Regions:
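Segments forming glycine/polar-rich beta-alpha architectures that bind adenosine-containing cofactors
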Residues: 192, 208-216
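Active-site-proximal, well-structured secondary-structure segments within enzyme catalytic domains
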Residues: 230-232
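Glycine- and small hydrophobic-enriched segments that form the cores of compact globular domains
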Residues: 223-226
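N-terminal helix-rich structural modules
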Residues: 1-163, 167-177, 183-201
Length: 232
């Protein structure tokens, strides 16, 4: 069960912010491969920042949702990145270390960019102004209209729509990408399922097996009614 949870770690990072995995890999590569003075204030502050990112599964505080302010300089980080093996960095196709820095540094260093993981300020579009990666190109109004259309007033066991999906806009249409085997995060979820199936085989009793079986079924199908059964 612990291994199943570990397989989902990167999913949580990505859900908490679109650039979290890229930033974590940049930080970890410098942390492991840096050849300079590790007692230098910039490196020490990078290490502190990385540990906060690890603990919070992203660049925002896990409770307050405020973005962490790095105490190391952009100049230090750029130089450090240019002195590690570029093959270890999360470069997009055709991207150089400099263009990677240009793309990502505003997310790290500019306090106005993605400043809140979850924004709850009155009068603002809470979807567009939140850094959490549950929506892509979708407004709050569009998200509310999409999920309201799915609700059935006659359903005496309503599910929590949107709990296991990302809303995206493709060709001008809002679509739901469900987290499940064969869907969004499918490769990681298949690994979670693999470890849950191993846990099922060594469960101590039928109650444990029944609970694990429901969770496996939920990850395979993405059916929120199954998740309710598992939770209860």
């Amino acid at each position: 069960l612990s291994q199943a949870a570990l397989e989902g770690r990167d999913i949580l990072f990505d859900q908490n912010g679109k650039y979290n995995l890229v930033i974590r890999r940049m930080l970890e590569t410098v942390y492991t491969d840096y050849q300079g003075n590790r007692a230098d204030a910039d490196f020490v502050n990078l290490e502190i920042y990385l540990k906060r990112v690890w603990f919070s599964n992203g660049i925002h505080h896990h409770y307050a949702s405020d973005k962490f302010v790095p105490a190391f300089t952009p100049e230090f980080f750029r130089t450090a990145l240019k002195n590690v093996d570029a093959a270890k960095l999360p470069l997009a196709d055709g991207e150089t270390v400099d263009t990677l820095c240009d793309r990502i540094f505003p997310v790290i260093f500019d306090p106005k960019v993605m400043s809140k993981r979850v924004n709850q300020a009155d009068g603002e579009d809470l979807v567009l102004t939140s850094a959490a990666n549950y929506y892509d190109g979708v407004t709050q109004q569009e998200a509310e209209e999409f999920y309201n259309a799915l609700k059935n007033p006659a359903d005496d066991q309503p599910v929590m729509f949107g709990m296991n999906s990302r809303l995206v806009k493709e060709n001008g249409q809002v679509q739901e990408k469900v987290w499940k085997s064969g869907g969004l995060y499918g490769a990681a979820i298949d690994k979670i399922i693999c470890w849950l199936e191993k846990a099922f085989e060594v469960a101590e009793n039928e109650v444990q097996r029944a609970v694990i079986e429901k969770l496996i079924r939920f990850y395979k199908e993405g059916d929120l009614h199954t998740f309710d059964e598992y939770s209860i």
